[in-house]
């Protein structure tokens, strides 16, 4: 077993909230492993997280980790008012030669009254996000747990879960 079955990462040492969930991992074209996680302790409530953790490893045992705390990083913008930054995931953008990080956001100021899916590129060393996040899509109802895959023909498919009313369910 990996690391002789011993824990590799302790969430209370890598996150501001001392807890993580929704891990997503992939291997990059450079051979490194990249992981993103929600920085959250569930017992504090569903609207209790304000960021994510970006991680990178050569061997899946030793990890570099960096928190992205939205109220601090995006002070003075709508992103400073997030009540949740949920289920971040990554995909490598071959054209840009960068990792795209995408996630759901909800704010408490009315500017994002339901979970919308946003995205931003990670910086070169996968320690932060570049620029302000942009809307990936707006389903006009809560959308969470997004996943993007590329098929063998180079076509991208987006899967997500909806949370609102009659539209509730998984979509492609």
Tell where the protein language model's regions lie, with residue ranges.
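Beta-rich carbohydrate-recognition and catalytic domains
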Residues: 1-85, 91-172
């Amino acid at each position: 077993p990996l690391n002789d079955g011993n824990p590799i990462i302790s969430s209370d040492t890598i996150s501001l909230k001392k807890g993580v969930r929704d891990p997503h991992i992939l291997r990059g074209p450079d051979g490194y492993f990249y992981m993103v996680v929600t920085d959250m302790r569930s017992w504090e409530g569903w609207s209790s997280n304000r960021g994510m953790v970006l991680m990178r490893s050569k061997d899946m045992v030793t990890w570099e980790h960096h928190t992205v705390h939205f109220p601090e990083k995006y002070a003075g913008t709508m992103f400073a008012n997030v009540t949740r930054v949920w289920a971040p995931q990554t995909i490598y953008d071959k054209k840009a030669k960068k990792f795209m990080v995408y996630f759901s956001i909800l704010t408490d100021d009315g500017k994002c009254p339901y979970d919308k899916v946003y995205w931003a590129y990670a910086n070169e060393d996968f320690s932060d996000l570049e620029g302000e996040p942009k809307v990936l899509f707006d389903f006009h109802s809560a959308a969470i747990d997004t996943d993007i895959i590329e098929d063998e023909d180079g076509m991208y498919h987006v899967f997500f879960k909806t949370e609102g009313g009659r539209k509730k369910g998984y979509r492609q």
